[in-house]
């Protein structure tokens, strides 16, 4: 929730306490009918979620990257979509959702984040009052994601769709625990406009409409996403592999490392420009 800081309100008005009270009501006192979550609300949200799941395929870039994670992490929580699958959502009943709700608010890990000018004691008091009815019966340990195992042979999956632009996504397991080094390496490899993927695969050779890489810190793996012409599949894959090999062999120039460090430093400094970025940073630690 976001509100105007009290310092900018006229006549000494305060919004912190009313806002935390609304949050407390939403979480601790949802609309119930005969002891269960409102069937009408559950049905409405179930329909909305199924619509979102069905429409996910329309955004091919995101869909392809999501499918890569599903295949790489099949059978793991990391491989599941954050909006679930249609069959599971369709099976949700008000009774089952109510039971899950009670379990979640009683046992799930609870973290409260505040960014603003208010004194910490005032913030703590506001949240304690707002969440005074929150039942707690012991927490459930937060399961840590396990590093992705290295495959002995590459797994290749092709899906045919009626599209004008192909999507080529590649995933790699990272065989090192030096995550800071991997962050720098990934930045040089494909995370910025100065990266090897962008400058070579996209700009120099024109094999991709876009090409970028992402480091999944929790799973210690790197994924590459690219948009290609169908006939360029093998050429693009070979060149992506060649750029990764160049990184592995230390084939880069000093300016590439300098640019990566500068990009990462600027990114860290910019976190303080946004309350939401600060929240994401701390929650991700």
Spans of features found by a protein language model:
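Charge-rich, well-structured scaffold segments of protease-associated domains
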Residues: 1-139, 203-285
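His/Glu-based metal-binding/catalytic segments typifying zinc-dependent metallopeptidases
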Residues: 109, 137-198
